[in-house]
Amino acid sequence: MIKRIISIVFLLLTLPQLALAVRIKDIASFDGVRENQLIGYGLVVGLNGTGDSDQTNFPVQSLANVLERMGVTVNRNDITVKNVAAVMVTANLPPFAKQGTRIDTLVSSMGDAKSIAGGTLLMTPLKGADGRVYAVAQGGVLTNSFSYGGQAASAQKNHPTAGRVPNGGLVELELPNVLSDRGQLRLNLHQPDFTTATRIAQAVNERFKGGVAAATDPGAVMMNLPEAYKGRVVEFVADMERLEVRPDAMAKVVLNERTGTIVIGDNVRISTVAVSHGNLTLYIKETPKVSQPAPFSKTGETVVVPRTEIKVNEGGGGLAVVKEGASIGEVVRALNALGVTPRDLIGILQAIKAAGAMQAEVEVI
């Protein structure tokens, strides 16, 4: 089974490596075109006795304030909140979201509520980092979970103290349009790289002619709006984002020792190195032996004699030689000949890197 898995990995790595071109819109985005995080404090009502306990004070204060704003005078000492839970509401405001646009919201309990499933989120203002209200949220909470219990047993599915309000947020304040009336745009790469940024600038200049784009650093490409697209920024962005480039990446090997996962980039190369692999199994068994004197002996005594059994089993090791400039597919094939497991391969790759024979960055997660 292990050899089959490694053979599959080798087959995938030794397939013809084609220069895969991707759209610019998939590897970069314009400066300012991003989501903005919103947050708010609210109440979930209508719970079936699974809300906050009386020991949690802020739900009582919040509920009293809500009732007073509605003209209902209450004594805070008489309020119980078993059917109410104080929650934090979060959401992401998409770029170019217009007034009246619906967005999803996340609801998370703040107190000691057992479950907010089936409750209703009361109208909650959602603020941005600048303190302004950009949306309001309200609606039924969906948790896809439950929590039931008795005196001797309980049952729970998923996480009943956090849920979603699908389309529960309503945008009230729009973000400014960062693309309108701008003669210069900055394109930010999701993964900064000198080569990729240069290729993007070259592709844009070939398509629109002239010095439209220039890579200012590995993470940004500055673009001047062509004269033919004056007043038509959206059309220019649409035409530019459809262009395809071949992104470049630094050679990297990612190892996860907890799960045995290995991810190896296509650009990884190995210098000439010899690899030996062997398995050593040590088996130790203690079997104490009791020695008793002969019957009716007056001088003898019962003693315990230790007896240790040791077995050493060393698997058949081997020596594999990896040639100069070998690709990662060739490395896997050489190591496969030694019969290594994925976890053994992690140790071997780390040893190759320590020997200075791997021209790649090794990241352990």
From Swiss-Prot:
<protein>
    <recommendedName>
        <fullName>Flagellar P-ring protein</fullName>
    </recommendedName>
</protein>
<dbReference type="Pfam" id="PF02119">
    <property type="entry name" value="FlgI"/>
</dbReference>
<keyword id="KW-0574">Periplasm</keyword>
<keyword id="KW-0975">Bacterial flagellum</keyword>
<dbReference type="GO" id="GO:0030288">
    <property type="term" value="C:outer membrane-bounded periplasmic space"/>
</dbReference>
<comment type="function">
    <text>Assembles around the rod to form the L-ring and probably protects the motor/basal body from shearing forces during rotation.</text>
</comment>
<feature type="signal peptide">
    <location>
        <begin position="1"/>
        <end position="21"/>
    </location>
</feature>
<keyword id="KW-0732">Signal</keyword>
<comment type="subunit">
    <text>The basal body constitutes a major portion of the flagellar organelle and consists of four rings (L,P,S, and M) mounted on a central rod.</text>
</comment>
<dbReference type="GO" id="GO:0071973">
    <property type="term" value="P:bacterial-type flagellum-dependent cell motility"/>
</dbReference>
<dbReference type="GO" id="GO:0009428">
    <property type="term" value="C:bacterial-type flagellum basal body, distal rod, P ring"/>
</dbReference>
<dbReference type="GO" id="GO:0005198">
    <property type="term" value="F:structural molecule activity"/>
</dbReference>
<dbReference type="InterPro" id="IPR001782">
    <property type="entry name" value="Flag_FlgI"/>
</dbReference>
<comment type="similarity">
    <text>Belongs to the FlgI family.</text>
</comment>
